[in-house]
């Protein structure tokens, strides 16, 4: 059996705020979708990011509620440690909450963490040395 990660599903309490965060992060999600119940963004070289409102999730599963706590994190790689700092600063300046300031980790990456509008931790990282 072959298996491939196809879609990362993200439930949004407020679609406009959630899409705004990921646009600020750098994903070119088209404008004009902030009031949709479901938005699929096909990343250029990875899985689809499927955004679904909490109301739409309740239509599929009537008892659905956004969970408390962190059950996963999203990790976005940029090209350099400076880009980690720049993107982190941009997100904080746009009013998003910091989870941890950028730092160099012993495993060879610079990373910073912010929270999206629904409290999910989003990691921004780059390798400290040149590698893919």
Regions found by a protein language model. Name each.
Residues 120-124:
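Short, conserved beta-strand/loop elements in beta-sheet-dominated catalytic cores
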């Amino acid at each position: 059996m072959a298996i491939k990660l196809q879609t990362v599903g993200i439930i949004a309490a407020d679609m406009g705020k959630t899409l705004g965060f990921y646009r600020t992060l750098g994903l070119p999600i088209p404008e004009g979708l902030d009031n949709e119940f479901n938005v699929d963004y096909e990343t250029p070289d990875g899985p689809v990011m499927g955004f679904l409102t909490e109301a739409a999730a309740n239509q599929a599963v009537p008892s659905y509620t956004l969970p408390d706590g962190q059950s996963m994190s999203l990790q976005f790689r940029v090209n350099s440690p400076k880009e980690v700092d720049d993107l982190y600063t941009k997100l904080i300046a746009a009013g998003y909450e910091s989870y941890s300031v950028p730092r160099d980790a012993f495993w060879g990456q610079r990373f910073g963490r912010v929270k999206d509008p629904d409290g999910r931790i989003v990691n921004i990282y780059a390798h400290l040395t040149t590698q893919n």
